[in-house]
Amino acid sequence: MHEMRKAGLKAAVYDAGTSFGGTWRWNVYPGARVDSPVPIYELAIPEVYKDWHWTTNYPNWEELQAYFDHMDKVLNLSKDCSFETVVTSAEFDMEEGKWNVGTQDGRKAKAKFLIVCAGFAAKRYIPGFPSMDKFKGTIHHSSFWPVEGVPYEGKRVAIIGTGASGVQMIQVSH
């Protein structure tokens, strides 16, 4: 968005999340942090990085969210964004030479260019287990963890998964 504005383009962003940060707005489980050093997560925009100081080379989700909030405060990108908005259709009109975009809440937009930024983490995967419907406990997914946390102390907890989120949760759950 920042580069598009600098190029004189008018743009709009539709994002299913509540604010900037993508996966770092959804993944707020205990122990969630980057597994690559911060330069990979930092924008190469002097206005943003000149007033920002990381507390660690491997920040957690809270610091990343604060960074994205700082970025928005400096660049004022959210004025052209619609958060909590799911795009449900995008069709190219050959005659008009534009994209017709529709959202879940009924909004329509037209655009000469369409950039889809739905990465591998855009859709949660919850495997089906036999008798899962009979389980009487609570089930949480790491990418939809409540920000206020989950009181799991003193309870028997099963963590299913071998990726970064599973490993990070195991480290802080004992």
Where in the sequence are the language-model features?
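Feature captures the FAD/FMN-dependent oxidoreductase FAD-binding
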Residues: 55-121
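Conserved beta-strand scaffold positions in the cores of enzyme catalytic domains, especially
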Residues: 13, 81-82, 137-140
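Glycine-rich dinucleotide-binding loop and its adjacent helix/turn
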Residues: 48-54, 60-63, 118-173
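Glycine-rich active-site loop/strand segments that organize a redox cofactor
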Residues: 18-21, 25-67
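Short beta-strand "acidic-cap" motif of Rossmann-like dinucleotide-binding folds
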Residues: 8-16, 24
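Gly/Ala-rich phosphate-binding loop of Rossmann-like dinucleotide-binding domains
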Residues: 1, 5-6, 170, 174
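Glycine-rich, phosphate-binding/catalytic loops in enzymes
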Residues: 5-7, 29-30, 131-134
